[in-house]
């Protein structure tokens, strides 16, 4: 228990009880589920949430036909961000965010996308598990204004000591990128309720982790 509380302090940067984190997760899951129902209704789908997920997994319109198509769609989202980012972020890094596919030797075991200083990697392996309706949220999280911009800007702040420019603090690093997914709504980047639903799917992943992590490691599930 003491070690788990230490891990919470490290990753959350606050002395929160596991029970409080668990309760927050449950509340977020309930809230996001309600928002998912709203987004689903806006698509015109008339079934249950489970049936909607099955529909999204099986309808070919939600998946790229080629690696090139997936990369082009990601590039288009990045270009749209470039056109509006100055209205939302006051100080931008000099380093642009470059788009590349995940290398072939890594792709089968890699995440859907990964962002670093001035870099956005998109996984084009096994396209039937890379839904296009989550691509705007993924791109906002990993590229700009997410990790790709966030880390590039931190590295350019030369007046700060190295430990502040290069140290990874999960609460800040991932918290900022998660906020960027939400910011996409304000930026007008979710064109359809399907894409807004994709953003909510990403939010739901994080909420479920709060519940499952504390359930396994503290509540003896």
Locate the predicted segments by residue:
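N-terminal maturation segment of proteins
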Residues: 1-221
